[in-house]
From Swiss-Prot:
Keyword annotations: Cell inner membrane, Cell membrane, Chaperone, Membrane, Transmembrane, Transmembrane helix
Protein name: Co-chaperone protein DjlA
Any GO CC annotation of this UniProt entry: plasma membrane
Location, primary (coarse class): membrane
Keyword Membrane among record annotations: yes
Every J domain range: 211-277
Function: Regulatory DnaK co-chaperone. Direct interaction between DnaK and DjlA is needed for the induction of the wcaABCDE operon, involved in the synthesis of a colanic acid polysaccharide capsule, possibly through activation of the RcsB/RcsC phosphotransfer signaling pathway. The colanic acid capsule may help the bacterium survive conditions outside the host.
PROSITE patterns: DNAJ_2
Residue intervals on the Periplasmic side: 1-6
HAMAP family: DjlA
Amino acid sequence: MRYWGKLLGLVLGVMYAPGVVGALLGLLVGHMVDRALGAKRRGFFADQQTRQSLFFRTTFQVMGHLTKAKGRVTEVDIQLASQLMDRMQLHGAARTAAQQAFREGKESHFPLRKALQEFRRVCFGRFDLIRIFLEIQLQAAFADGSLHPNERQVLYVIAEELGISRGQFDQFLRMFDGGRQFGGHGGWQGQQGGYSQSGYQRASQGPTLEDACKVLGVNSSDDSVAIKRAYRKLMGEHHPDKLVAKGLPPEMMEMAKQKAQEIQAAYDLIKREKGFK
């Protein structure tokens, strides 16, 4: 029922401030509560097709906005977007829609926060979808092997609007860094290097125990119980079929599979190095 907030507000308003003023204030507060709850209900009950469509469009809009943040869209940025569309096997109308969304995001007046708020509302209660979305945007941000200060600021806005704290975002960056050494992200970006405090450097060797721990978000000193728990959690969050059922566009299933393979490879390396099954 959409009027419980107003009714409750009316009763409380009259109780605390008898008369017309109390009733009006109560109705106003109740109306705001009804609107907030209504928005959450619409997000929770959004049908799968609506969620997939919005995920698809917002992904390319925000990607376009992000790549434009540093002042110009480079050839590498365009190649990344094109490669992503190829990987998703986008052709015909679907590819045209993705390209149009990318161009919309590049416009100076693109309402980034509004688009992200709508995306978050439709993904209500589905953090795994939000996580995949952020991982895709990180791919775009690091397409040319470096992170421009303006891109970093846009990423902070993206994280903020998606309900991700600064600490969580920094953790995502570390996990992203480790994953590049396993070929999962590198497959999208070519032979880019890893991240350090001084910037991105070209990798000169294969993945290390430290890289693998970054992927799982654990420390090398953690015991097998903690590592297995982190591994199972990540695999559950990146299960392709579950993600599609929750609203991930089917075209993006391949990316979810690659991420799951990256997590598995990191876990296998940790098991070998630490000697547990």
